Amino acid sequence: MSGRGKGGKGLGKGGAKR
């Protein structure tokens, strides 16, 4: 929910991925 503009391209969250 916090890493949306970081690595959340098509994941929605991405914060945990990037």
Curated annotation (Swiss-Prot):
Residues that bear N-acetylserine: S2
Residues with the N6-acetyl-N6-methyllysine modification: K6, K13
Family: Belongs to the histone H4 family.
Name of the molecule in the record: Histone H4
GO molecular function, one term: DNA binding
Keywords: Acetylation, Chromosome, DNA-binding, Methylation, Nucleosome core, Nucleus
Its job: Core component of nucleosome. Nucleosomes wrap and compact DNA into chromatin, limiting DNA accessibility to the cellular machineries which require DNA as a template. Histones thereby play a central role in transcription regulation, DNA repair, DNA replication and chromosomal stability. DNA accessibility is regulated via a complex set of post-translational modifications of histones, also called histone code, and nucleosome remodeling.
Listed GO CC annotations: nucleosome; nucleus
Quaternary organization: The nucleosome is a histone octamer containing two molecules each of H2A, H2B, H3 and H4 assembled in one H3-H4 heterotetramer and two H2A-H2B heterodimers. The octamer wraps approximately 147 bp of DNA.
Modified sites of kind N6-acetyllysine: K6, K13, K17
Location of the protein in the cell: Nucleus; Chromosome
